[in-house]
């Protein structure tokens, strides 16, 4: 059976786990309707992007 030759140091263990944390998603308010949207993305509520309507959203 395979067994580690040396104990993994806390530093190595921490470096390995450094990518496991959850990242906080970034949101910003849509200037047109005020709903939260992802940056550099179309607003799902009103269909606006960069000050103009890209997709017409049926109400």
Curated annotation (Swiss-Prot):
This is Large ribosomal subunit protein bL32. PANTHER family: 50S RIBOSOMAL PROTEIN L32, LARGE RIBOSOMAL SUBUNIT PROTEIN BL32. GO terms for cellular component: large ribosomal subunit. Residues 1-20 are annotated as: Disordered. Signal peptide: none annotated. GO terms for biological process: translation. Coiled coil: none annotated. The gene is rpmF. Keywords: Ribonucleoprotein, Ribosomal protein. Residues 1-16 have a biased composition (Basic residues). Belongs to the bacterial ribosomal protein bL32 family. It holds the Pfam family Ribosomal_L32p. GO terms for molecular function: structural constituent of ribosome.
